[in-house]
């Protein structure tokens, strides 16, 4: 940041006037970094996403600025660029600006389509970025930087928070809570799928007078009928309590000796969790298999509608995993749809 108006200077030069300052007179007064928040999936070749922005809120704090055309309720369509906002962090040093920007992104409430927020935070907090090692090859050379920001314990806390929030929202005793088993002799359970095609997590809660026993089980496939045969692992000393909070609920969850206040918001089958340090999104699986979906078949799909511009295979061709099947044009970009298996 130098306090100079470069646009005004360009106009002055175009009019034949001299520059008002020479290089030695320009003094840096701080640093600013801009991050572009996109509805795109870094884990799937940055494929753009569409959908409803259920909630968008940015915390006010010194040094943070947000330029955005979206509000809560906005729809991200396939007809335009998927950029959601430009977020700028300003500080006395480059490290300060990066820290302010990362903190603002983390504390932002963004309930909607898959986006690149976690990747931006990981980059801003990486040693390579803070050291200034930022060429155009950064993402290719620093692939490890884009590893998940949240830990396994964070994911466990969020899954437990979702389970307790769902139970609280379906409180009537004489009703069957959506996605919950209410058999008195059996533990209550709910199955959740993490965002981005992640595996399934089943949270099982045994209710006791002296406290709940919380267990977790992870699978690659939805464990409908076999849920009780899963070797669910108990979370020793885990506890949770629900507190009302505006439109949603706050669940205070303790796992591995670390407690977190998890704000949980639900929109249909989508559930979002924010704890002030990490965010996650989940899909609530129905209690029983939807056979109409099973009959629909399986195969490669895309999260965004578009126009098929090229077909790379023909009926009867043998394909291998990772092979391009079709090219799809959407949001001013071309996307390859790949085979999932051989």
Predicted regions and their residues:
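Catalytic cores of soluble metabolic enzymes centered on carboxylation/carboxyl-transfer
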Residues: 2-224, 231-233, 324
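SH3/SH3-like beta-barrel fold
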Residues: 213-217, 253, 272-274, 337
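Catalytic P-loop NTP-binding/switch module of NTPases
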Residues: 259-303
């Amino acid at each position: 940041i130098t306090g100079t108006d470069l646009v005004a200077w360009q106009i002055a030069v175009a009019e034949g006037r001299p520059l008002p300052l020479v290089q030695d007179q320009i003094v840096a007064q701080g640093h600013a970094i801009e991050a572009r928040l996109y509805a795109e999936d870094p884990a799937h070749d940055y494929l753009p996403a569409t959908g409803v922005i259920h909630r968008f809120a940015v915390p006010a704090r010194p040094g943070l600025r947000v330029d955005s055309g979206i509000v809560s309720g906005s729809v991200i369509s396939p007809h335009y660029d998927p950029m959601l906002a430009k977020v700028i962090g300003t500080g006395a040093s480059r490290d300060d600006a990066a820290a302010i920007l990362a903190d603002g992104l983390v504390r932002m409430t963004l309930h909607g389509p898959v986006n690149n927020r976690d990747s931006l935070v990981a980059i801003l907090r990486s040693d390579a970025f803070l050291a200034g090692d930022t060429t155009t090859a950064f993402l290719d050379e620093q692939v490890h930087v884009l590893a998940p920001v949240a830990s396994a314990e964070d994911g466990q806390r969020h899954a437990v928070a979702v389970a307790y929030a769902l139970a609280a929202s379906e409180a009537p005793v004489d009703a069957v809570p959506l996605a919950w088993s209410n058999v008195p002799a059996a533990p209550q359970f709910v199955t959740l799928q993490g965002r981005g095609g992640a595996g399934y997590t089943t949270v099982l809660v045994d209710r006791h007078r002296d406290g709940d026993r919380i267990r977790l089980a992870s699978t690659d496939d939805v464990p409908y009928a076999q849920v009780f045969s899963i070797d669910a692992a108990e979370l020793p000393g885990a506890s949770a309590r629900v507190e009302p909070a505006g439109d949603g609920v706050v669940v205070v969850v303790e796992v591995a000796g670390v407690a977190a206040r998890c704000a949980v918001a639900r929109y249909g089958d989508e559930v979002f969790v924010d704890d002030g340090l990490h965010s996650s999104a989940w899909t609530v699986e129905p209690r029983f298999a939807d056979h109409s979906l099973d009959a629909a078949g399986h195969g490669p799909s895309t999260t965004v509608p578009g126009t098929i511009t090229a077909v790379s295979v023909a009926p009867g061709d043998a394909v291998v995993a990772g092979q391009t099947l079709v090219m799809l044009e959407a949001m001013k970009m071309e996307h390859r749809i790949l085979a999932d298996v051989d």
